[in-house]
Amino acid sequence: MNVHVSPDSLVIAGKTYGSRLLTGTGKFKDLEETRLATEAAGAQIVTVAIRRTNIGQNPGEPNLLDVLPPERYTILPNTAGCYTAEDAVRTCRLARELLDGHNLTKLEVLGDQKSLYPDVVQTLKAAEQLVKDGFEVMVYTSDDPILAKRLEEIGCAAVMPLAAPIGSGLGIQNKYNLLQIIEDAKVPIIVDAGVGTASDAAIAMELGCDGVLMNTAIAGARHPVLMASAMRKAVEAGREAFLAGRIPRKRYASASSPVDGLIG
């Protein structure tokens, strides 16, 4: 994959990535569309729901790793579908076995099936256990700055606050909480859930997020591969805008042309 690595590259758990767009692998019509969309996104980290996706646990079924090989992508197993800390920890341990000792994992412990909001009590409990077990934990959480800091202090490798409910496409609903999380953090902050279109991804990056993870926004689009390409450009543009620094907002106009030396 031709992904430019610069001094501004994303670093997670000691590994450097040229792309700040992380993608999911669910909801695509088939494995070929998954492959094409992942390539169009330029993603280097792809997340996989261990309880829903075959990565070797079912030998007779199509294997996602045949189209997204671990030699090319960092596979990020996640605990989607888990509602208790115990289930999440068990799922991570299974993933580590299937991926030959791979320790990077995405933790999510959900509160209920309607909202898919994280159960923060169970999330904290699972995060503490997984860190003790030697996992590098990227954790899905609410946009609560206090909780985000606590997860960082536990030892999580990245904190992943939601922008809006999973799959909602509502975009960033509370940018001020995200800003506080970003300002206080010493680990990467990656927006996870709620992105609907390219402008949402760009806004997240303009705020100073280190990356964006998405699945439904790409897989649910009319043309997923084209949307993946759009998201790639949005993340890159948003990051460059953040680094460049936006102009201050003003209530009144400010002429862009100099007034000195006017003719007449």
From Swiss-Prot:
Entry-linked InterPro entries: Aldolase_TIM (IPR013785), Thiazole_synthase_ThiG (IPR033983), ThiG (IPR008867)
The protein's Enzyme Commission number: 2.8.1.10
UniProtKB keywords: Cytoplasm, Schiff base, Thiamine biosynthesis, Transferase
Pfam family of the protein (one): ThiG
Record function comment: Catalyzes the rearrangement of 1-deoxy-D-xylulose 5-phosphate (DXP) to produce the thiazole phosphate moiety of thiamine. Sulfur is provided by the thiocarboxylate moiety of the carrier protein ThiS. In vitro, sulfur can be provided by H(2)S.
Family affiliation: Belongs to the ThiG family.
Assembly and binders: Homotetramer. Forms heterodimers with either ThiH or ThiS.
Protein name, entry field: Thiazole synthase
Source organism of the structure: Stenotrophomonas maltophilia (strain K279a)
